[in-house]
Amino acid sequence: MTIQDLSISLDTVWMLLAAMLVFFMQPGFALCEAGFTRSKNTANILFKNFVDFMFGSLLFWLIGFGFMFGSDGQGFIGMPHFGDFSFYTHPAGLPTEGFLIFQTVFCATSATIVSGAMAERTKFSMYCVYSVFISLLIYPISGHWTWGGGWLCNGEAGSFMMDTFGYAFHDFAGSAIVHSVGGVLAFVGAIALGPRLGKYGKDGKSRAIPGHNLMAASLGVFILWFGWFGFNPGSQLAASGEVNRVAISHVFLTTNLAAAAGGLATMFTSWIKYGKPSFSLTLNGILAGLVAITAGCDLVSPLGAAIIGFLAGIILVFSIEFIDTKLHVDDPVGASSVHGVCGIFGTLMTGLLAVDGGTFYGGGFGFFGAQCLGILCIDVWAAVTGAILFFGIKKLVGLRVDKRIEEEGLDIYEHGESCYN
């Protein structure tokens, strides 16, 4: 075995270990969403997380991977190869099947973000339809623009991004591609569904509908925090050599600092704003920090990471309140704010706080401009496709369960079983 073989083997093991950590985020999402919703819908919300991963695994393998990483002439969409990966060779020599698994768990993460925002009133059959479309089309196409060699990430001389901004769009681990796509789809889906029964009074004021188990939600957030150490550092896709081990260590640090700063910022903001520190908001604040740092965790300094996480934690509190009380969009778990708003925020802050090229480090506005255009195009794509999908389903066959089913719980009526007996 040569040194090169040993290096590729080590990199492969690291990539697959990171994929396992990201897969473990699925039970984190499931527990978090279940804890923030009512007990009568627990089996339904847990089931939807399994559905996302089952559909995602098969459809991304069969078609989505080709759309995302297949070759094309315009940089918009790759060519599907229907389960045949002979077309693809990883630049660093990593096994294609291992790389497929790594990308599959990211696709499933984006899909599962939506389930919490649409909780407690969505037809299970129609949620399955959504899950098919995000894994098959919505996520892979925007992913192609950035991670698949498409137009947004093209840093070659003469490319549109380099001629316009002097920089390509940068999203290291998915603040935009994974989280803002999921968050925007969650927001559009919640609008299409309408609020839960009893959420808003006749006067239009929002009424709290507490979740049933903060213990489950807190365990879910701990699992997500842990899984993020595969999500972000794993996106380096290599562990051998000094450059990679330094990069992984740096990303571990920036990821953790942003999470801690986000949680503390939300805790203090809720304490000042509402008179008491909110545990449920703080849990989401931790996730807000993690989401926000994901785009630039490789480029910002530790201080920059803490600043991004802290600001995301503050923004989260006001975003959740604004979406709930002003826009009257009922998002039971705050996914639109955590993943959508904070994903956008983190992507933009990368252009400001990147040590190399960031506006605040003397790099001008080129990098920031590239980030602005990138997040705009990605989220417009998610919003338009999501609107066509959700409002199309609503018009044709109905997206929401009947009033009686919603009142008595989806577990019994949709699945014939209850999570608690």
Language model: regions and residue ranges:
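Glycine- and aromatic-enriched membrane alpha-helices
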Residues: 1-421
